[in-house]
Every structure is written in structure tokens, then in C-alpha cells.
Amino acid sequence: MARFPRQQLYIHGAYVDASSNQTFESINPANGEVLAEVAEAGAADLERAVESAEQGQRIWAALTGIERARIMRRAVDLLRERNDELALLETLDTGKPLSETRSVDIITGADVLEYYAGLAPAIEGEQIPLRDSSFVYTRREPLGVVAGIGAWNYPIQIALWKAAPALAAGNAMIFKPSEVTPLSALRLAEIFSEAGLPDGVFNVLTGSGAGVGALITEHPRIAKVSFTGGVATGKKVMASAAGSSLKDVTMELGGKSPLIVCEDADLDRAADIAVMANFFSSGQVCTNGTRVFIPAGLKASFEAKLLERVQRVRLGDPQQEATNFGPLVSFAHMDKVLDYIAQGKAAGARILCGGERVTEGEYARGAFVAPTIFSDCSDDMSIVREEIFGPVLSLLEYQGEDEAIRRANDTEYGLAAGVVTPDLARAHRIIHRLEAGICWINTWGESPAQMPVGGYKQSGIGRENGIASLAHYTRVKSVQVELGEFASVF
């Protein structure tokens, strides 16, 4: 029997059944428990959601920026009041430790919503003088109905990252959470309604990416799609968005990010950063620094420091306060990660720790994989070239700065990168040569609301967060005004 009642769709401020009456299961990856039967949305449900969103958007866009900001801030307050309740739901659905979801997921999502609430009244156009009798002014107008398609690793945070700038600009959003972790987006929709968001301005359709997800990208009355997920799926989304109605797209896709440890680095600090950049959230973070470059002469010392820190990993029941490392998000994903680990072993990489599923006692019921470090890696190995999205660190030795930069850039991805060195001139020199959209110096992983997030190359298009994101949810209308006589050539 499922822990929660059957989960419906959320359309026009209320829960409704899916037209097909079909469902799928949401599973707790820590123990295999069925959390809920969840409605599978189809074409008729999407049409209903679009019509609802169009109605709600007209009301929402007619409000002033200050009025929209007040409602958004009420939602922020509700999110913070219910932080622990939402964190537990997120832990059950994702397998992430409660210590993590309580301190990161809802808090950082609420921060982004508050940030864009502050920007909503500041959306403005320009006045451009042409001559004494004429000028141009511009208006930043909402796109209308937009869509967000979320990933499974940060369900409510990603929903807020996409909804916040869209709502600030006066749009309505249809959001599809990942079918792997669908529960918290529905609670977010309830909170938005309670805060006073007009019906239809935030609708949630649960279901598969291949099903309702594909229908969303094709719908001619949806003006934009913001997608977070893998590169292969992102390419399909972009092709469908362009082929249907030339939709605008924002995409945050995969990564295989390099972390360069310089020869003058504090190795204790570098080891702390490397472990956080690979094992936080059980390695299921898009920006993880999975390719760690270390000077050849420091490799043995650095390996020892990494192993010291792995001893501090407390794998366990995600609901226990002491746990800081939970299961992977699903059993299917666990199998994928284990396959990559097997490929690494077969290719000749040397295992320093982990490299296997954890099956002792109660862990046999969950999707637990031990933190894994490979050394003696080469750039042509699949564990070095392909995104694993799990707790797998690949250690690569290098001889000089130019070599490290060249090899760091030798990838189809360009999401994130980092460097560890006390020499700030060197740090900036290296960072400026790295082909990545998000970079860190002597730290890793923080993505505050003010910081634009997005990738180079095949890691994405556009940006989320920061002022830059707001422009992706508006369109510019130019208006010329003539105060003098009109001179016709006819």
C-alpha cells in the first residue's frame, strides 16, 4: 500500500484527475517503498492546462510588478514556514539525506523566488531620443504561457528556479516535474494558490518525458520551454520546440566538469573541495567536478587525503540526522552508475575506494552505491569522457598548466570548472581559458540566486538565475512616437 494518496494533476488552482485515468508509481529509493500512485497526464490534460494558463496569465500580467511581488513574497513565507515538511517529502522522493534537503533544497528555491519578487517591479523599458520631434520607447512584455520541464535531482528547487523569473515577468507556467520525483512540485502549486496566485498561473502536469513532456514541447500556444536534463533529451526538446512554433528555449544540460588542483594548492583544502564536488547529493549534481586534475608529483599525497575524507562519509537511512550520503535516485539509475564503474575497472583505472553497490542488511532494499574514486585514469576512458551522474571521481595527473587546461577543455561539455590555488593571478588566468559557464576559485558548488547558471558547448543554452534570466522571459516591443508633421514621399 502506498504511503500517500493517489496524486492528481494540478490545473486552475485545483487537483483534477488525468483524462486517461492512468498512473505511475513514485518509489522511495532508500527502501523500494511505493510512495504514491501518480496521475499520467495526456494530450487532453495539456490542452486544459494551456487554456487555464492563458486565462490566468491575462489576469497576472495585468497586475503591477509590485502586486505580483507581494504574492510571490507570500509564497516565499509559506515555503519557509513549511521547510521541514517539504524537506521530508523531498527526502522520501529523491533519497537525499534530510540534513541536506532541510538546509539546501527548499531554502535555496525560496531564495530565488524572493530574489525575483524583488526584481518584478524593476522590469522596465528604455526611451531612445531620435530627434527633437521623435523618440522611441521600448516595453518588456511577458511571453504568455511558458513551460518548465524539471530534472529529478533537485525537484522543488528547479521548479522554483524556472517559475520565479517567469512569474516575475508576468507569464503563466505549466510545469512538468520528472516522473522519477514528481511529488514536491504539486505541493508547490498548492502554496502558490494559497499565496494568492491567480488560478492557472502555475499548473502542474505529472507524467513521462516521452509522453506529456514531448507534447508540451510541441504545443503551438506555449511560447517557451525551460528544460533541465540530459544532452540527448535536450536536443530532442530543442528540435521539437523549433519545429512546432520556433519556441524560445533555455536548457541546463549535462556536464563533465574539471577541477584543476595546482602544485601550490593547499592539498587539505583541495581534497575537501574535490570530495564535496563529487559526493554531495550522492554525486547527482549537474555541476559536479568529476575530472580532478592533480600534478603528477602530488598524486600519492592527494590520494591519501581523499581517502581520509571518504572516511567521513556517513552512508545510511536518509531520514536519520547523522546521514550525509544517501541512495541514488532510482534502481534504474543505480544500474547505470554500476555499469560505468564496471567500465572503469575494465579499462584499467585503479580503484581507491568504493566501486560497488552497498547491500549489507537494510541497504539491500535501497539503491546505495559506495563513494568511488578511480586513479590512474586516462582521458579516453568512458568514466572520464561521459557523464555518470553518480558518486564516481576520476583522478588524472598532469605535468603543466597548459596541459591541464587543454585536457580540461577536451570535452563536449562546458557546464562548470574550478581551480584550487592561493595565487589569484594564476587562478584567474586559468579560469579565463577554461570553456565553462560556471566557474569556482578555491570553492565549489554554490549557486546563489544572483549568479547566472548555464553552460557552454553542449551543456546548455541561456541562463537561469541572476538578472540575465529575466530577459529570457520577456520580449521587447519597440514603439516610435512622432510629435511633428509626417512627411510622405507620395
Curated annotation (Swiss-Prot):
<dbReference type="GO" id="GO:0008802">
    <property type="term" value="F:betaine-aldehyde dehydrogenase (NAD+) activity"/>
</dbReference>
<comment type="similarity">
    <text>Belongs to the aldehyde dehydrogenase family.</text>
</comment>
<feature type="binding site" description="covalent">
    <location>
        <position position="286"/>
    </location>
    <ligand>
        <name>NAD(+)</name>
    </ligand>
</feature>
<keyword id="KW-0520">NAD</keyword>
<dbReference type="InterPro" id="IPR029510">
    <property type="entry name" value="Ald_DH_CS_GLU"/>
</dbReference>
<keyword id="KW-0479">Metal-binding</keyword>
<dbReference type="GO" id="GO:0046872">
    <property type="term" value="F:metal ion binding"/>
</dbReference>
<comment type="subunit">
    <text>Dimer of dimers.</text>
</comment>
<feature type="active site" description="Proton acceptor">
    <location>
        <position position="252"/>
    </location>
</feature>
<dbReference type="Pfam" id="PF00171">
    <property type="entry name" value="Aldedh"/>
</dbReference>
<feature type="modified residue" description="Cysteine sulfenic acid (-SOH)">
    <location>
        <position position="286"/>
    </location>
</feature>
<comment type="pathway">
    <text>Amine and polyamine biosynthesis; betaine biosynthesis via choline pathway; betaine from betaine aldehyde: step 1/1.</text>
</comment>
<dbReference type="InterPro" id="IPR016162">
    <property type="entry name" value="Ald_DH_N"/>
</dbReference>
<dbReference type="InterPro" id="IPR011264">
    <property type="entry name" value="BADH"/>
</dbReference>
<feature type="active site" description="Charge relay system">
    <location>
        <position position="162"/>
    </location>
</feature>
<dbReference type="InterPro" id="IPR016163">
    <property type="entry name" value="Ald_DH_C"/>
</dbReference>
<feature type="binding site">
    <location>
        <position position="387"/>
    </location>
    <ligand>
        <name>NAD(+)</name>
    </ligand>
</feature>
<feature type="binding site">
    <location>
        <position position="246"/>
    </location>
    <ligand>
        <name>K(+) 2</name>
    </ligand>
</feature>
<feature type="active site" description="Nucleophile">
    <location>
        <position position="286"/>
    </location>
</feature>
<dbReference type="InterPro" id="IPR016161">
    <property type="entry name" value="Ald_DH/histidinol_DH"/>
</dbReference>
<dbReference type="InterPro" id="IPR016160">
    <property type="entry name" value="Ald_DH_CS_CYS"/>
</dbReference>
<keyword id="KW-0560">Oxidoreductase</keyword>
<dbReference type="InterPro" id="IPR015590">
    <property type="entry name" value="Aldehyde_DH_dom"/>
</dbReference>
<feature type="binding site">
    <location>
        <begin position="176"/>
        <end position="179"/>
    </location>
    <ligand>
        <name>NAD(+)</name>
    </ligand>
</feature>
<dbReference type="GO" id="GO:0019285">
    <property type="term" value="P:glycine betaine biosynthetic process from choline"/>
</dbReference>
<feature type="binding site">
    <location>
        <begin position="230"/>
        <end position="233"/>
    </location>
    <ligand>
        <name>NAD(+)</name>
    </ligand>
</feature>
<feature type="binding site">
    <location>
        <position position="180"/>
    </location>
    <ligand>
        <name>K(+) 1</name>
    </ligand>
</feature>
<feature type="binding site">
    <location>
        <position position="93"/>
    </location>
    <ligand>
        <name>K(+) 1</name>
    </ligand>
</feature>
<feature type="binding site">
    <location>
        <position position="26"/>
    </location>
    <ligand>
        <name>K(+) 1</name>
    </ligand>
</feature>
<protein>
    <recommendedName>
        <fullName>Betaine aldehyde dehydrogenase</fullName>
        <ecNumber>1.2.1.8</ecNumber>
    </recommendedName>
</protein>
<feature type="binding site">
    <location>
        <position position="254"/>
    </location>
    <ligand>
        <name>NAD(+)</name>
    </ligand>
</feature>
<keyword id="KW-0630">Potassium</keyword>
<feature type="site" description="Seems to be a necessary countercharge to the potassium cations">
    <location>
        <position position="248"/>
    </location>
</feature>
<comment type="function">
    <text>Involved in the biosynthesis of the osmoprotectant glycine betaine. Catalyzes the irreversible oxidation of betaine aldehyde to the corresponding acid.</text>
</comment>
<keyword id="KW-0558">Oxidation</keyword>
<feature type="active site" description="Charge relay system">
    <location>
        <position position="464"/>
    </location>
</feature>
<feature type="binding site">
    <location>
        <begin position="150"/>
        <end position="152"/>
    </location>
    <ligand>
        <name>NAD(+)</name>
    </ligand>
</feature>
<feature type="binding site">
    <location>
        <position position="460"/>
    </location>
    <ligand>
        <name>K(+) 2</name>
    </ligand>
</feature>
<keyword id="KW-0521">NADP</keyword>
<feature type="binding site">
    <location>
        <position position="457"/>
    </location>
    <ligand>
        <name>K(+) 2</name>
    </ligand>
</feature>
<feature type="binding site">
    <location>
        <position position="27"/>
    </location>
    <ligand>
        <name>K(+) 1</name>
    </ligand>
</feature>
